Amino acid sequence: MSRMAFDRQKIVEAVKEAKARAKPRNFTQSVEVAVNLKDIDLKRPENRFKLEVVLPHGRGKDVKIAVIADGAVAEAARRLGLDVISSAELEEIAKSPRQARKLAKKYDFFIAEAPLMPKIGRYLGRYLGPRNKMPVVVPPTMTNIEPIVEKLKKTVRIQLKDNPVVHAPVGTEKMSDEQLAENIEAVLNAIIGKLERGENQIRSVYVKTTMGPAVRVEG
């Protein structure tokens, strides 16, 4: 695909059509992008990737963040009104696979103090890892985690693993077409940066709402 395939106006048009074709629901639908790749051998580990992309206009909705910590980091989290999981609570959660799964599903991101990471890996790794939700690690002496929290509120995590397609939430239907298009561009640029032959390995790009049909970004 040529650079013109990602012309901003073409993305805006696809977003506009995806929103128009979405039936009204009694909730605010998310807007997602799907990027189909080609000529990539996913049996080779070096071709797989995980990415964190900061969306210029944020996700358009609240992001649930939990902090696994004691001491200074826990206090910093409480000042920001975040949910805190202490090391003692972590031990209790470890005894119940059901609780661990529920925890992994409930939150979008986790922040954890470094000394607890061995326990987190042992107790929660099997639940957080496959969901691409392993914690952002901070030192136990950190007293201000607000910059990290603010960044996470605008961040999406995406990964290329077994199938040659990358999915990413890019906002909600209440955001403007231009804001969503800029967020999509940020995701596309991040993916292109990880591909050996860049945009030439992108087969197609689709935009859709949660319950609506997929609309192709025309090249």
Swiss-Prot record:
The keyword Thylakoid does not apply. Binds directly to 23S rRNA. Probably involved in E site tRNA release. Protein L1 is also a translational repressor protein, it controls the translation of its operon by binding to its mRNA. Part of the 50S ribosomal subunit. One of its GO terms (molecular function) is tRNA binding. The keyword Ion transport does not apply. Belongs to the universal ribosomal protein uL1 family. Coiled coil: none annotated. One of its GO terms (cellular component) is large ribosomal subunit. This is Large ribosomal subunit protein uL1. GO terms for biological process: regulation of translation; translation. InterPro entries: Ribosomal_uL1, Ribosomal_uL1-like, Ribosomal_uL1/biogenesis, Ribosomal_uL1_3-a/b-sand, Ribosomal_uL1_arc, Ribosomal_uL1_CS. HAMAP family: Ribosomal_uL1_A (MF_01318_A). It holds the Pfam family Ribosomal_L1. Transmembrane segments: none annotated.
